[in-house]
Amino acid sequence: GNIISGGTVLIENGKIAAVGPDSQVAVPAGAREIDATGMWVTPGLLDAHSHMSIEGGGNEGADSVTPEVRIIDVINHRDESLFRALAGGVTTINVLHGSANTIGGQNAILKLRWGKSADELLFDNVTRGVKFALGENPKRARAVERYPSTRMGVEFTLRKSFAEAREYQAKWDEYEATRSRGVDALAPRRDLRLEAL
C-alpha cells in the first residue's frame, strides 16, 4: 500500500476503525491520542503455521489418524515465546498439530494477549481445522511401528478415514430425519474421531 505521511489511525474497541490523512479521519471527542511522529504503524502479523507454546509434544504418534485430539489442550499460556512473538508484532497464531500423522489433531487459532489463560486466547466462533500431512512425513514418523510406512499407505489411510466419516455422517443424518418425522430412534454411538472428520 501507500505510505501516509501525517496520517491518523483510529482504533475503536481494540480494532482499526479508520486510516488516512489527518484531514480525512474524524477523531471522536475525548479520544486518547498518541503522537507517533517519526514512527511506523503496521497491522499485526499473523503466523499461519505455528507450533508455538505446545507443551509435551505436538504429535500423537501411536496412531496415524488422530483428529479427535486438540492442540488447545496442550497450550502453555505462560510460554515466553508467546510474549516474544507479541513483542515482535505477531498478534495471531494458528497453532497446528505436528506432521507425524496422516490425519493429525485439531488446530487452535489464538489472539495473543500476555497473561490470559489458554481458553481466553482462543478466537470465539472459529471452526477448528485438522492438520493433514501427506507423503514423507507420516511414513517417516516411525517412533513406534505403525501403519502406514509407504506413500500408498498414506493415501489409503486418507481414503479409508473419509469413507468411514461419510458413513458415520449418513447414520446421523438418518437418525435426525427419523426424529424429524416424530418417530423415536436410537441415536448412533458418538465417535469423536469421526465427528472431527
Q: What are the language-model segments listed below?
A:
Residues 11, 18, 80, 84, ...:
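Extracytoplasmic/secreted proteins, especially bacterial periplasmic and envelope-associated proteins
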Residues 3, 49, 102-103:
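Solvent-exposed alpha-helices and their adjacent loops that cap or buttress functional pockets
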Residues 13-15, 21-23, 50, 97-99, ...:
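A mature extracytoplasmic/lumenal domain signature
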Residues 77-78, 193:
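Amphipathic coiled-coil/heptad-repeat helices and related helical stalk/stem segments
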Residues 2-42:
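Histidine-rich, glycine-flanked metal-binding segment
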Residues 86-197:
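Polyanionic/metal-chelating signatures
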